[in-house]
Amino acid sequence: MVKFLSLTSSVTALLLLSLGANGVAAAATTCTVAKSGSDDTAAITKAFSDCKNGGTVVFSKDTTYNLNGILILSDLKNVNIELAGTIKLPGFDKAVKGLKSYIQLIGTNVKVYGGGVINANHSSVSDISIINSPRAHMGVTNATDVLINNITLHTASTSSLRPKNTDALDVSRSSNVVFQNSKLTVGDDCLAINEEVTNVTLSKITCNGGHGFSVGSLGKGGANQHVKTVRIHDSVCNDCQNGVRIKTWPGGKGSVSDIKFNNVELNNVENPILITTHYCDKNQMNYCTNNDKTSLSISDVVISDITGSASNDGNPIVSINCSTSTPCTDFTLSGVKITKASNTPKNVCVNLDGSSKIAECSA
């Protein structure tokens, strides 16, 4: 399932979103969404119902469709969605709070493509872009073979407060996900890989002001969770809170393995390389302290050719802090060339097997 996320009025739009296969599925039936007035929810629902088995749903060019309700479009199979027009979302609606989305597409081999517009929070966005999201922009859940390509996200605060929880992409319970060729301005994770995920590749992404490229958080409340085979490469993070990161909770179970960060440029970043098994919310500190000795196992991690500069927040360039009973293992660091600030302290490697042989741990 791919969620078009919107707690109040954000929505996910993908230049090409693929569930189950590459390319655009062959579709014999075309269902053009009728323009019905101030609320086009029913017309959109009907078009998807009529074309849910091997059809193409068309949002016409130069047409604005008003969505005043929640759309859960299920049982889709081999459906193409041609977004040539504009979808305009409503403002805050309490009914959507529990779902965290205005639009959900549920099915197999569903494609979204075209050069249309989604209007969120009364702001026009084009070329499959999302602006001013009050919550996470995109979510991939219970899906396989997903391609997210050439999108633009821009959510920035108009005050000194950061736009919290505005992740660019959250992935959970999915496999074979590719996110590439995109520009992001967000207030939280540029990528957050959550539980039961295998084979994610992120490349050629520029992220501004976010929390970096993250695996986790994982293991909250003692959960048993797993992430395997993640490739993050040829990307940039500017003015980010974190650069490349793995974060797990104390007391968690499971594993994180086969993770590679390569050729990532981090400019003016607070925590360029941050790996911790001590991630915790402020209101959970007692639990975290009592379960601090164990967490998920983190192994087979390669960090190479990381360049850029550290901010003057006084954090180490490399901070790897693992648990005493579940130390991190099989780490390789090379080509870390981050320019220090005047107050940058020495790097930290705690409970990392083989740290004495890793040059970056003593830098």
From Swiss-Prot:
It comes from the Eukaryota. It is an enzyme of class 3 (hydrolase). N-glycosylated. GO terms for molecular function: galacturan 1,4-alpha-galacturonidase activity; polygalacturonase activity; rhamnogalacturonan alpha-L-rhamnopyranosyl-(1->4)-alpha-D-galactopyranosyluronide lyase activity. InterPro entries: Glyco_hydro_28, PbH1, Pectin_lyas_fold, Pectin_lyase_fold/virulence. Disulfide bonds join C190-C207, C322-C328. Glycans are attached at N121, N142, N150, N199, N321. Pfam families: Glyco_hydro_28. Keywords: Cell wall biogenesis/degradation, Disulfide bond, Glycoprotein, Glycosidase, Hydrolase, Repeat, Secreted, Signal. The active site is at D188, H211. Its main location: secreted. Residues 1-26 form the signal peptide. GO terms for cellular component: extracellular region. Belongs to the glycosyl hydrolase 28 family. PANTHER family: PECTIN LYASE SUPERFAMILY PROTEIN-RELATED, PTHR31736. This is Exopolygalacturonase rpg13. It comes from Rhizopus delemar (strain RA 99-880 / ATCC MYA-4621 / FGSC 9543 / NRRL 43880) (Mucormycosis agent).
